[in-house]
Amino acid sequence: MATSAPGVPSSAAVREESPGSSWKEGAFERPYVAFDPDLLALNEALCAELLAACHVVGVPPASALDEDVESDVAPAPPRPRGAAREASGGRGPGSARGPPADPTAEGLLDTGPFAAASVDTFALDRPCLVCRTIELYKQAYRLSPQWVADYAFLCAKCLGAPHCAASIFVAAFEFVYVMDHHFLRTKKATLVGSFARFALTINDIHRHFFLHCCFRTDGGVPGRHAQKQPRPTPSPGAAKVQYSNYSFLAQSATRALIGTLASGGDDGAGAGAGGGSGTQPSLTTALMNWKDCARLLDCTEGKRGGGDSCCTRAAARNGEFEAAAGALAQGGEPETWAYADLILLLLAGTPAVWESGPRLRAAADARRAAVSESWEAHRGARMRDAAPRFAQFAEPQPQPDLDLGPLMATVLKHGRGRGRTGGECLLCNLLLVRAYWLAMRRLRASVVRYSENNTSLFDCIVPVVDQLEADPEAQPGDGGRFVSLLRAAGPEAIFKHMFCDPMCAITEMEVDPWVLFGHPRADHRDELQLHKAKLACGNEFEGRVCIALRALIYTFKTYQVFVPKPTALATFVREAGALLRRHSISLLSLEHTLCTYV
């Protein structure tokens, strides 16, 4: 196959329609509404394909790393399947790490080669395959104004959505939907099957729509273009250079965290980020210089005495939405819970969930069955036409590591668990559902108000959840899903999300309910079309918080896995605390969160 860049097929994921299209009849008759849970039911085969794409692929130990793969993640020794839960704290309290794996034992999977191939997506000098796919469609078929409007709607929703596994999965599904909506019937071109052949990966979606945000227009600082006297830049393109430095930090951290999957989540455990063997020198330098990176993308830089910031504006808008939603509580707004079930499907059996139950086990079993079936169904297409970088995983022996679960869909992409928490926050995923966004705000307020005495915030969580469970009127009308998900997360994860973790706190600020939930509905066609046209013509895709806070997040979360030397850790805690205070974000001890949770 001809290539236009090293390892990038010139045809990308563009493919003529297969004889049996998996879209349900009438799937493209409705007007497109981004992040609509009902869309997931229109193509169950695509959902299963994406679930499989969210998994790490293991190969037999004898398989060698493809010579064409260039990566800084060395292949790790094979591990027994199911060992991931025992890494760094185990699946539950008190679990012990087993003896080293016997290379001759049955059932071994080597996930090192796949981790090595996957990290190549996260590099500044590697093309974005989502951008490349769009460009190929543009050259081959031209992009209509209607496509631009739908794509703009998807991009706007991604900017307002939480950075989480559910959002990444939805973005992947809807990117395929938008492309097929406009090109399947007229041009017989489809993206269904592209993830199964590795022409696109879930990491490509994560990078394009969430990590780098290729469509973002504010240079990483919301409102920068609206400033009356914008800060002078030293040279043309300086803003993009500054943003690329952040992107390098975020992508380097992601590469290192993916590297932990090379040995089932245990690689680099205990290694120091300040020179330990668990990280690369480039990452160590980027982490040490995070403050310089953040300073250039900080909306509070140069301001004295705190005051207005991106987060104070976001908090005010959140309050306005909550008040408006309360006033319209009896207005019959339709609520859907498909994303609650999707969250359960993605996170059951992973370190994000620490309390098991029949519903969780059923979700994990359903996911395993769907992934296995989809992997087998696409075996022939994968062997005929796999992307060169992943060619070795198209052979008959490789298979998804069902025990690790869909960790590639998560933001941090590691399987580490500590303090009964995991890298992926279940509660951040819940922010994708309108009723849960509102319920989470009420839940936090109830925890804070529960005791007038000096009872610790942690001790207030379980009684408040108990009260919520006992009062059906106080719950969203979701058949008990919300309370079940809170129980599954556990009090430690709730405590971490609400009061401790800067990633969760900043995600709460990033999620824009006006963008996610405040647009015209599908049955208001004219208003919806006007809304999408304004998004497309305005070309103002601004984030809600400045990228300086994202730089802090990636440094913080990497330091939780690759613990730095004490001096570097103390410096980071001091500088990170100052940045959070300037943005009016109040959290419990960062030292506690760094050392206790993950």
Swiss-Prot record:
InterPro entries per the UniProt record, alphabetical: Herpes_env
Binding positions (Zn(2+) 1): 128, 131, 208, 214
Key words of the record: Host cytoplasm, Host nucleus, Metal-binding, Zinc, Zinc-finger
Source organism, top-level taxon: Viruses
Family matches, as Pfam families: Herpes_env
Residue sites binding Zn(2+) 3 per the record: 310-311, 546, 583
Region (Disordered): 1-23, 66-107
Region Zinc finger 3, annotated ranges: 310-583
Localization: Host cytoplasm; Host nucleus
Positions bound to Zn(2+) 2: 425, 428, 497, 504
Region (Zinc finger 1): 128-214
One MF annotation (Gene Ontology) recorded for this entry: zinc ion binding
Keyword RNA-binding included in the entry's annotation: no
UniProt KW Zinc-finger keyword: yes
Cellular component, GO annotation: host cell cytoplasm; host cell nucleus; viral envelope
Purpose: Plays a role in efficient localization of neo-synthesized capsids to nuclear replication compartments, thereby controlling cleavage and packaging of virus genomic DNA.
Protein family (similarity comment): Belongs to the herpesviridae UL32 protein family.
Protein name, as recorded: Packaging protein UL32
Underlying gene: UL32
